[in-house]
Amino acid sequence: MKKQNLNSILLMYINYIINYFNNIHKNQLKKDWIMEYEYMYKFLMNNMTCFIKWDNNKILLLLDMYYNVLYNYHKQRTPMSNKRLMNSKNIMDYKLLYTYFYILNKMKMEMDNYNNNNNNISLKYNELLKNIMNNLNYKTSNIETNLSNNFYLMDKYLINKYMKYLDMLNMIPNNYMFNNINYKGKLNIKTVLDLNNNEFYDYLSGLIEGDGYIGPGGITITNHANDVLNTIFINKRIKNSILVEKWMDTLKDNPYFVNAFSINIKTNLAKEKIFTNIYNKLYSDYKINQINNHIPYYNYLKINNKLPIKNIMDIKNNYWLAGFTAADGSFLSSMYNPKDTLLFKNMRPSYVISQVETRKELIYLIQESFDLSISNVKKVGNRKLKDFKLFTRTTDELMKFIYYFDKFLPLHDNKQFNYIKFRFNTFIKSYNWNNRVFGLVLSEYINNIKIDNYDYYYYNKYINMHNARKPKGYIK
């Protein structure tokens, strides 16, 4: 038997997947042939000549992505029609995140061992590949069972997978050729817990400007449930504060659904610590007036009875915008798919941040600080309620924010990971042709990784470790 190299085996695996899709297509009703299968099947069929020129790492990433879809098919015998495959709001998303890298490492070991072995192996190549598939189906099921019994362990794996993705994507600017981007920067991977005091309070000031309220009783910061890690880290950093779960009243059909978390800062010790550190780090008149209106309630604070003044520091040189974006900003990674072909998919990454009219000066502050056109600020809404939105899409505009967020954005949560996808897709837009096909495939892969809301059961197991308090009137 002629010995094959790893690249040949990987290409055989792609052929095996094509045949697998063919069988699914023949044996399933048309309504079960969902969009993800259609796209992946056509992409494989149309681009085999491109794959032959790829290196092994690219092919392994491609196979990793495709295995995820096949694995979903095995786990969900009835595929979901008219829904994105990875948008299911349950714990399966977390199990799959861990499964990705297990599969990738398993494939590497199996194929490397086979490639380095002698010629006396009796297995044929297609039999080997089928055995790999069967082994993975069995072993990943056991992994999921173990992880589902320990949510904290599962979350730990999730964070580790983030770091691996970050490491992989961090190499993109240095290892790939771009047409019009000259960028040598790298992600500064840290969490809120890693910031020094000055950096943390810059970040906290921005977060309070967006999602905070300063009242006579203290400070309340409310974050969406998707940003639970961010909330927990901030609560841990502040100390002497209370973490409270919140439920949406409108979700009567699911009374256990956690919608948001609040950090309540009410003790005098915590309030003195926060106020003295954010006192002159605010940019909006709205939040400054909240402090001014409640100064009598804080007469015990050592702030010399001076009214706060508006911050005049350059927001490009501190963590304020990172905190403000965590509250009210979004990193989007949409894709434009022309009608004529799947091959020329275009990326449409964008950075969006909005504020109500009473705080529109913050939008103009960002626009001026990053030297953007006034046309980037749009007024949206109806006659009674208007929002001011900053919207950026051109590569030059997006690169200005990438230079900033690479340096100042803490990475540990859903919105921060959306930034990684946004950043990656911005670079994809400027790939030269040799790398563009691979970039588009990898972008599809990265964009399918999402964090959705946990259901109450898993939230409860996780949050109880952090002493979250349930709201008054909660009925178990």
Curated annotation (Swiss-Prot):
InterPro entries: Homing_endonucl, LAGLIDADG_dom. One of its GO terms (cellular component) is mitochondrion. It holds the Pfam family LAGLIDADG_1. GO terms for biological process: mitochondrial DNA metabolic process; regulation of DNA recombination; RNA splicing. Its EC number is 3.1.21.-. It is found in: Mitochondrion. GO terms for molecular function: endonuclease activity. It comes from the Eukaryota. The keyword Mitochondrion applies. Keywords: Endonuclease, Hydrolase, Mitochondrion, Nuclease. The N-terminus is blocked. Endonuclease SceI (Endo.SceI) is a heterodimer of ENS2 and SSC1. Catalytic component of endonuclease SceI (Endo.SceI), which cleaves specifically at multiple sites on mitochondrial DNA and produces double-stranded breaks. Belongs to the LAGLIDADG endonuclease family. This is Endonuclease SceI small subunit.
